[in-house]
Amino acid sequence: MLDLYNGEIITYTIGSRPVYSLVSTMLDQAFKRLADEDTLLIHSDQGWHYQMKPYRHALEQRGIKQSMSRKGNCYDNAVIESFFGTMKSEFLYLNEFDSIEHFKQELSTYIDYYNHKRIKAKLKGMSPVQYRTHAQQIA
């Protein structure tokens, strides 16, 4: 889950097959980071798990508006698709992994780097976390 404000990866889950618990766990993890008064919009593709009643109900309970891309239109998800492209070129294609567990450990390290250390020109030369922290300090 990526925050459009600063490009920070808020949370993620990984599994060997697409099951609803991956999405529900990710949503629960994101909820723990939110203040009750936060007003949000969550955008996704039209994957079956994002259309399930429990998922939609969880969003409604938190007052979160749901937005879904048009069917078969990757451009509606350009921000996350761009992140995946960056992650592949900076992380996936440059490394070899001995096991799934090794991959998961290295992915966690990369996400931490991406959020805390990797600077972005559009964030005035700051990392996503630095940018968010800076904005909170001057607000």
Predicted features by range, described:
Residues 1-139:
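Charged DNA-binding/catalytic regions of mobile-element recombinases
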